[in-house]
């Protein structure tokens, strides 16, 4: 074996070992604060994985659907859950691939979320409900409503993305990125870097919050844990 080839193998092995060690470190530390509680909820067994949800209050059924970002979860609604529960039976859901729900290595599409939302309303809620959706989750909620018109009574969309953005078809670059992310070790390493605390803090400062003084470390930690939970 040539020295250059042997050196390349050694460097490659060291790099893979380093990425594996980093991934293990992230896995062990991400949920150590245990901010995403599971004892206050239930799991709905869907065909592609278990979906975590909570149910609170009594009254008109209300479904709260968080953003489809993997850092998001039903905890987005924690500040208003108690107030909404006074007159409603409030359901929060962690979409597949987010929060406390399973994170299978599958292709995540808007239509998949449509299927999840439709199945959840039919199987768990059991009747037409009001729904509130944020950002990217607005699209599957509207699609679900269009496909099954008796699914929702009232629909509220918070900061929905522009229709022009929803109309975009995944190109080769986005498909390649998805393929890379799904790779073992290397893909997980890239994902962990993209979902690092530093990246998350920048996201809050540049996109989520107009005033940085409103950003709390607990909220950031919850989003970080959601991205790595399970």
PLM region spans:
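A short loop-to-beta-strand scaffold at the N-terminal edge of the catalytic core in hydrolase folds
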Residues: 42-56
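Conserved catalytic-core motifs of eukaryotic protein kinase domains, centered on the activation segment
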Residues: 74-76, 101-107, 167-169
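Conserved HGGG/HGGXW glycine-rich cap/lid loop of the alpha/beta-hydrolase fold
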Residues: 55-100
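Conserved hydrolase catalytic core segment
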Residues: 124-170
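Active-site loop/oxyanion-hole signature of alpha/beta-hydrolase fold enzymes
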Residues: 82, 92-132
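Hydrophobic alpha-helical topogenic segments used for membrane insertion/localization
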Residues: 2-26
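A catalytic-pocket lid/entrance helix-loop region that shapes and gates access to the active site
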Residues: 167-186
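Conserved alpha/beta-hydrolase catalytic His-Asp/Glu region
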Residues: 167, 192-230
């Amino acid at each position: 074996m040539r020295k250059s080839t042997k050196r390349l193998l050694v460097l490659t092995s060291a790099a893979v070992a380093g990425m594996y060690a980093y991934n293990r470190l992230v896995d062990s530390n991400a949920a150590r604060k245990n901010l995403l509680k599971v004892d206050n909820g239930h799991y709905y067994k869907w065909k592609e994985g278990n979906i975590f949800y909570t149910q609170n209050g009594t009254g008109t059924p209300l479904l709260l659907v968080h953003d489809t970002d993997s850092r998001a979860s039903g905890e987005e609604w924690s500040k208003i859950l108690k107030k909404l529960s006074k007159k409603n039976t409030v359901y929060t859901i962690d979409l597949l691939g987010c929060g406390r729900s399973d994170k299978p290595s599958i292709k995540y599409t808007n239509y998949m979320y449509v299927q999840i939302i439709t199945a959840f309303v039919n199987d768990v809620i059991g009747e037409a409900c009001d729904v509130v959706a944020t950002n990217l989750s607005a699209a599957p909620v509207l699609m679900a409503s269009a496909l099954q018109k008796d699914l929702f009574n009232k629909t509220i969309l918070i900061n929905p993305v522009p229709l022009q953005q929803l109309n975009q078809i995944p190109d080769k670059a986005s498909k390649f990125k998805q393929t890379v992310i799904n790779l073992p070790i290397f893909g997980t390493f890239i994902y962990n870097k993209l979902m690092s605390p530093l990246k998350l803090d920048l996201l809050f400062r540049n996109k989520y919050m107009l005033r940085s003084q409103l950003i709390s470390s607990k909220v950031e930690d919850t989003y970080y844990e959601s991205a790595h939970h399970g």
